[in-house]
Amino acid sequence: MPEASKEIIRAAKKGDVAKVRGLVATDAGLVHAQDSDGSTPLHCATWKGHLDTVAFLLSAGANVNAHNRNDHWGTTPLHAAAHANQAAIAKLLIEHGADVNAKDLNGKTPMHHTTFHKAKAVAKLLQSYDAI
C-alpha cells in the first residue's frame, strides 16, 4: 500500500481531520484509499466514531456505500456505524445516500448488525428509514 494511503488510513482512525484534509488537498483520490482489509478512510473514521472526519470525507467524495471486500465481512461504512452504535454518524451516512439495506458478504444488513451488537440507537434510526 502506498505511503499516502497508509497515512490517510491512520489519520482517519485517529480522527485527525486536519491531516486528512491536508492529504486530500494533495491527492483527492486518497478518499478512496484502502487498507489491507479493503476498508476505506470512511470505514475507519466511522468505526472509531470520528464524526468530523466522516463529514469531511463525505464532502470530499468518499463512497458512502463502499464495501471492504478484502476481509471476510464485506461491510459498508453504515454496517460499521451499526456495529459500533454510532447513531450520529449513521444518520450522516444515510443523509449522504448510504443504502440502509446494503448486504455484507454474509447477507447481513446494517439492521442485522445492530441486533447482534445490541446497538439500540442505530437500530431505532434505521427503523425510521424502514430498514430491514
Where are these regions (language model features)?
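Ankyrin repeat structural motif
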Residues: 16-24, 50-58, 86-94, 120-127
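Ankyrin-repeat-protein effector appendages
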Residues: 1-10, 96, 116, 120-132
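Alpha-helical adaptor scaffolds
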Residues: 44-60, 65-75
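Ankyrin-repeat inter-repeat connecting loop/turn
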Residues: 30-31, 64, 100
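Ankyrin repeat A-helix N-terminal signature
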Residues: 10-15, 44-50, 80-86, 113-119
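Ankyrin-repeat boundary/linker signal
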Residues: 34, 67-70, 103
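Start-of-repeat signature of ankyrin repeats
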Residues: 4, 38, 71-74, 107
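Intrinsically disordered, low-complexity regulatory segments in ankyrin-centric signaling systems
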Residues: 1-26, 32, 36-39, 59, ...
